[in-house]
């Protein structure tokens, strides 16, 4: 390794040439690579100790963790005599040794140095911690390739190293046998496009915020901006004050250490998002209500109709279609049957004759549901059903937000590494969940954190309010107003009882008493009706238990009778 070499060879312009070079390097023996990495680390450690003893500058440092991983970080500081770049080179020696560059080849080391220099130039947020720490220990299950054994080991902190170092260290493991390797370039490009569309860069000017009025798009309340791992809240307040002023926001910190920033209007919300993005801060937020599209489901239109035709059809009605999506479903009628296990497997999915269309918000957007014809098709336009699922980010795989509004370093859903899911950098056979630390992927449907959030999303059943509570409340309110509730009208009274003088009320009293005796539940107040109902249910359950016992005894008696008949038939002379 050249510690002070500031000149690096540039990357090949063609990606195929780069991959071909990596394939040539991957032909080395893994055992040889392992020994070379360990020897290089040992020599680096000795040189670092001698350099630190004889100089006042910060020179290479070597760290070794408890899970047999070896990390070598080389940093060349800026001195008065010379100014060089910052390089970060790391290698991991674990249960599965991936294809790594042998010592002495400068092509991959130069590539890693360039990526490390790019990560170093990104900068650091002044009020945010460099790494994302976790207080709970996570259990990891190591599944070794071509073996049956499973070794359980414990990792105390998955994100102790900064994401920039982890990203640079993962470049040494470009070539692998990962099944998601074919999706690497596509996943990276998609995520870059998402960030470019939804997150503003630092080169754009922050718009002037008028704090004396609400946003022109609508008076809706802006969502919270969540900033994790804030170690210097005073610096955060200074950054927000310089952006939108001290009377335009409020902060609330949760028990998990996430600082939620609430702004007074949409203009302040957009200004804070752009300012935090320019500071290279890691945070996430949600979409403004006025920016959310109006999603409708168009039924009755053929699946092969071009999207441009649908856009023109909505434009004729005065609506702007932002996005059009045709859902797919499995075609079980044309499924192929595997010869090995005789199980039907779906080989493709067919498009449904339905479209989900995102329309731009407007004052008359609700009239889109009255559309009955689009072009030559008679259609039915309905409001798209809301998905009752847990929202999970496909970038950092944390629940509660989406990838389009996540400005955090990517985390792999398989190994919890600091790289995109499905990229060439994922070469580990370790499954690690980001949310619970279990030995499964972060997108697993059986994750206990996901199950708990689903349980909280379901509405809890409400118990019926007893009648006596309502009646008593009404009676108390009537008494407070000075009204006396009228007496109940007595029933079962004859003509003689009505015309009898008031002094003799024997028959009427007897009639009422006889009514009470005939209906014992009448003596109970309305508050005891539930107790009486519960008692009746218990009696019914007891009777049902007795009935089940009688039925069981009857079945056993019939069985014994049949056996007796069979014995008698067998003893009869032929």
Curated annotation (Swiss-Prot):
Superkingdom, natural source: Eukaryota
InterPro entries per the UniProt record, alphabetical: Pre_C2HC_dom
Keyword Cytoplasm tagged: no
MF annotations from Gene Ontology: zinc ion binding
Biological role: Strongly basic protein that binds directly to retroviral RNA and may be involved in its packaging and in the reverse transcription process.
Keywords linked to the UniProt accession: Metal-binding, Transposable element, Zinc, Zinc-finger
Protein's name in the database: Nucleic-acid-binding protein from mobile element jockey
unnamed zinc-finger residues: 393-406, 412-426, 433-447
Three zinc-finger-like regions: annotated segments: 393-447
Organism per entry: Drosophila funebris (Fruit fly)
């Amino acid at each position: 390794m050249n510690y002070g070499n500031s000149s690096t060879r540039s990357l090949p312009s063609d990606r195929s040439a780069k991959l071909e070079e990596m394939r040539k390097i991957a032909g080395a023996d893994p055992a040889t690579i392992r020994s070379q990495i360990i020897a290089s680390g040992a020599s680096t450690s000795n040189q670092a100790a001698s350099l630190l003893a004889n100089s006042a500058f910060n020179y290479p440092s070597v760290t070794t963790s408890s899970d047999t991983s070896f990390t070598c970080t080389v940093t060349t500081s800026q001195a008065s005599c010379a100014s060089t770049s910052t390089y970060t080179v790391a290698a991991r020696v674990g249960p599965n040794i991936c294809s790594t560059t042998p010592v002495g080849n400068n092509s991959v080391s130069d590539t890693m140095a360039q990526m490390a220099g790019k990560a170093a130039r990104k900068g650091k947020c002044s009020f945010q911690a460099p790494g994302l720490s976790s207080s709970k220990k996570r259990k990891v299950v190591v599944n070794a390739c071509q073996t049956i054994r499973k070794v359980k080991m414990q990792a105390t902190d998955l994100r102790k190293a900064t994401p920039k170092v982890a990203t640079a260290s993962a470049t040494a493991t470009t070539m692998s046998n990962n099944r998601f390797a074919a999706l690497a370039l596509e996943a990276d490009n998609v995520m870059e496009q998402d960030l470019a569309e939804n997150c503003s860069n630092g080169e754009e000017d922050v718009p002037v915020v008028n704090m004396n009025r609400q946003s022109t798009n609508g008076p809706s309340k802006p969502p919270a901006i969540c900033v994790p791992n804030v170690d210097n809240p005073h610096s955060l307040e200074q950054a927000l004050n310089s952006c939108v002023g001290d009377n335009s926001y409020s902060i609330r910190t949760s028990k998990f250490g996430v600082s939620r920033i609430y702004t007074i209007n949409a203009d302040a919300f957009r200004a804070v998002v752009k300012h935090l993005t320019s500071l290279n801060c890691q945070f996430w937020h949600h979409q403004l209500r006025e920016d959310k599209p109006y999603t409708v489901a168009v039924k009755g239109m053929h699946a092969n109709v071009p999207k441009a035709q649908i856009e023109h059809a909505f434009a004729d009605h005065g609506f702007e279609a932002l996005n059009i999506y045709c859902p797919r479903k499995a075609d079980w009628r044309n499924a192929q049957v595997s010869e090995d296990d005789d199980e039907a497997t779906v080989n493709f999915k067919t498009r449904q004759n339905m479209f989900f269309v995102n329309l731009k918000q407007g004052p008359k957007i609700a009239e889109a549901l009255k559309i009955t014809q689009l072009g030559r098709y008679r259609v039915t336009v309905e409001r798209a059903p809301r998905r009752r699922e847990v929202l999970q980010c496909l970038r950092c795989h944390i629940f509660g937000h989406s990838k389009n509004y996540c400005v955090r370093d990517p985390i792999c859903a398989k190994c919890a590494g600091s790289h995109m899911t499905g990229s060439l950098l994922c070469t580990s056979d370790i499954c690690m969940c980001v949310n619970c630390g279990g030995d499964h992927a972060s997108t697993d449907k059986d994750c206990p954190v996901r199950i708990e959030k689903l349980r909280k999303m379901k509405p809890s059943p409400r118990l019926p309010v007893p009648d006596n509570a309502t009646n008593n409340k009404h009676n108390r309110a009537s008494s407070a107003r000075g009204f006396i509730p009228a007496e109940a009208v007595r029933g079962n009274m004859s003509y003689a009882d009505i015309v009898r003088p008031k002094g003799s009320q024997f028959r009427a009293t007897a009639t009422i008493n006889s009514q009470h005796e005939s209906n014992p539940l009448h003596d109970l107040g309305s508050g005891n009706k539930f107790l009486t109902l519960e008692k009746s249910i218990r009696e019914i359950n007891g009777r049902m238990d007795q009935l089940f016992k009688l039925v069981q005894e009857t079945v056993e008696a019939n069985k014994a009778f049949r056996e007796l008949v069979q014995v008698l038939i067998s003893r009869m002379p032929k």
